[in-house]
């Protein structure tokens, strides 16, 4: 929610992986000293924007540094998602959902779902299906200026007709 302010972020690894974090919590004093001494470099990371349109016409617009995830609302059913890129149909996915990831987010949920790790300074997006009910569903890498549209497919009664969208 603070993405429009353009305040630099500094990642500190509090867990066990920390692919893109610059510091470890055990070195917090050194980190603070370097920041106060202007002894650091900055990287401009790509963000993605998304718009959620509900059935009753409401819209919600947000930005994400890591990813936008569309997932099923129910626990026991698949969700069908039709994906379009620049207005052209790309694929129909059935599964637990879809991740639209930035290069920064490629080492997070995207990686856990089997997606590729990409250079954090690259200008691209990754679409990765989450637990696809298919033998051939793989991640797709797109240019950063591609317009991705996703619609809930209503092909079978056993599919969810609602989704949960998260911006990270």
Predicted regions and their residues:
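Gly/Ser-rich helix-loop-strand patches that form or flank binding pockets
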Residues: 2-15, 19
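A glycine- and small-aliphatic-rich helix-loop capping segment at beta-alpha/alpha-beta transitions
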Residues: 2-7, 25-30, 114-123
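Catalytic core of DAGKc-family lipid kinases
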Residues: 17-96
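Structural signature of FAD isoalloxazine-binding scaffolds in flavoprotein oxidoreductases
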Residues: 36, 119-120, 127-132, 141-153
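ATP/nucleoside-binding phosphotransfer catalytic cores, i.e., glycine-rich phosphate-binding loops
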Residues: 62, 70, 75, 86-89, ...
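Short aromatic-centered micro-motifs
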Residues: 83, 105, 165
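Gly/Ser/Thr-rich active-site loops/lids in small-molecule metabolic enzymes
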Residues: 92-95, 100-136
């Amino acid at each position: 929610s603070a993405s429009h302010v353009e305040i630099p972020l500094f990642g500190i690894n509090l867990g066990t992986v920390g692919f893109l974090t610059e510091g470890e919590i055990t070195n917090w004093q050194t980190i603070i000293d370097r920041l106060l001494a202007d002894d650091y470099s900055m990287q401009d990371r790509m963000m993605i924007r998304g718009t959620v349109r509900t059935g009753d016409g409401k819209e919600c617009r947000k930005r994400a540094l890591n990813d936008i995830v569309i997932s099923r609302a129910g626990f026991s059913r698949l969700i069908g998602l039709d994906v379009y890129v620049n207005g052209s149909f790309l694929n129909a996915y059935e599964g637990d959902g879809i991740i639209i990831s930035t290069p920064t987010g490629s080492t997070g949920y995207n990686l856990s779902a089997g997606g590729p790790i990409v250079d954090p300074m690259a200008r691209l997006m990754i679409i990765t299906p989450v637990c696809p009910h298919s033998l051939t569903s793989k991640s797709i890498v797109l240019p950063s200026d591609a317009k991705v549209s996703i619609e809930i497919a209503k092909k079978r009664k056993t599919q969810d007709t609602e989704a949960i969208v998260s911006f990270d």
